[in-house]
Curated annotation (Swiss-Prot):
Cofactor(s) demanded: pyridoxal 5'-phosphate
Species, as recorded: Saccharomyces cerevisiae (strain ATCC 204508 / S288c) (Baker's yeast)
Cross-link (Glycyl lysine isopeptide (Lys-Gly) (interchain with G-Cter in ubiquitin)): K228
Function, as annotated: Catalyzes the cleavage of L-allo-threonine and L-threonine to glycine and acetaldehyde.
Gene name of the encoded protein: GLY1
EC number: 4.1.2.48
Modification Phosphoserine occurs at: S367, S369
Keywords: Isopeptide bond, Lyase, Phosphoprotein, Pyridoxal phosphate, Ubl conjugation
Keyword Phosphoprotein: yes
Protein name: Low specificity L-threonine aldolase
Length: 387
């Protein structure tokens, strides 16, 4: 019998900077799972799942929560729940996860036209950006009126200024628009800014709150909103195959970090990112965005850096990178930080002698997690990913 082709065994997240999704369950989480409730969550009978939903909803100042297997699912069913009869359009940042990384879900599930907007300040959408791309429901039959604004906090690691969110919310209320937040990393925004989740909840009609990124849970997201909204969203979760039976184990594991000092964990990861950003700036390595939280985005195009070379340099030091997108989480060690500094510095120096042509077909992120030879070159071909 031919053996299955399996990936290498995953050992540790301490050297993995590809994404904050690579956090691994702690011993405390594994122990908690053994004591989890075993009710049927599809019928609303699982105690720990309900406890998780209510806990996150209350933290965000919302009436109800809905546990979903992923942020993609919670985003998509949230937007679908807000929308009624097409034609309509959704307005979001051109880099938004709901637009670029969710397999055309908005077009397929919500039948919506998406209006992607480039922020005029380069970092986040302002009210003026939104107004200039808003499609009014003014009787013009050629357009698809804007019904919903979707904002991401954080996006590219940038914390959305609270005062700008307040301005956008007021305008949405004046114009009868729903405001959704992809809060995959809203925990990071709350920790860094000091703005409580409840205050964000007062601004948005719905928030998708991820549990499996910086928070470290193995799976899941909680969609929060008012009771009527969540009741309807439950139908769409079922329709999309997202109902889970005994989800208590996953819920119990997620509650471990929520009930612990999650802010300190996140701020630790932010401090590593801040230190790397300062190092890059001191070396003259250009960055794409401010390193507000746990991400450092190296401007590979401006630096003429080859992302494959950067990945290989990381592997030389046993650090896993995803191109110029360096993502920190609470399980990354300071030793890894020092190693990634060396990898980036060497890739930058290499680019000075061998500038990379960035004008061909581009990919957003590149990654490889295989072994390397003595020179730091990957043994297997570098794999290219969008996310």
């Amino acid at each position: 019998m031919t053996e299955f082709e399996l990936p290498p065994k995953y050992i540790t997240a301490a050297n993995d900077l590809r994404s904050d999704t690579f956090t691994t369950p702690t011993a405390e989480m594994m122990e908690a799972a053994l004591e989890a409730s075993i009710g049927d969550a599809v019928y609303g009978e699982d105690v720990d799942t309900v406890r998780l939903e209510q806990t996150v909803a209350r933290m965000a100042g919302k009436e109800a929560g809905l546990f979903c297997v992923s942020g993609t699912l919670s985003n998509q069913i949230a937007i679908r729940t807000h929308l009624m009869q097409p034609p309509y359009s959704i307005l979001c940042d051109y880099r938004a996860h709901v637009y670029t990384h969710e397999a055309a879900g908005l077009a397929i599930l919500s039948q919506a036209m998406v209006v992607p907007v480039v922020p005029s300040n380069g970092d986040y959408l302002t009210l003026e950006d939104i107004k200039s791309h808003y499609v009014p429901d003014d009787g013009d039959i050629h357009g698809a009126p804007t019904r919903l604004i979707s904002l991401e906090n954080t996006l590219h690691g940038i914390v959305y200024p609270l005062e700008e969110l307040v301005r956008i919310k007021a305008w949405c209320m004046e114009n009868g628009l729903k405001l959704h937040c992809d809060g995959a990393r809203i925990w990071n925004a709350a920790a860094q800014s000091g703005v409580p989740l409840k205050q964000y909840g007062e601004i948005f009609d719905s928030i998708s709150i991820c549990l499996s990124k910086s928070m470290g849970a193995p799976i899941g997201s909680v969609l929060v909103g008012n009771l009527k909204f969540v009741k309807k969203a439950t139908h769409f979760r079922k329709q999309q195959g997202g109902g889970i039976r005994q989800s208590g184990m996953m819920a119990r594991m997620a509650l471990v970090n929520i009930n612990n000092d999650w802010k300190s964990q996140l701020l630790y990861s932010h401090s590593l990112a801040h230190e790397l950003a300062e190092y890059c700036e001191a070396k003259g390595i250009p960055l794409e965005s401010p390193a507000d939280t746990n991400f450092v985005f190296i401007n590979l195009k401006a630096a003429r850096m080859d992302p494959d070379v950067l990945v290989k340099k990381g592997l030389k030091y046993n650090v896993k990178l995803m191109g110029g997108r360096v993502s920190f989480h609470y399980q990354v060690t300071r030793d890894t930080l020092e190693k990634v500094k060396l990898a980036i510095s060497e890739a930058f120096d290499y680019a000075k002698e061998h500038p990379f042509d960035c004008n061909g077909p581009t990919q957003i992120y590149r990654s490889e997690s295989t072994e390397v030879d003595v020179d730091g070159n990957a043994i297997r071909e570098i794999k290219t990913y969008k996310y």
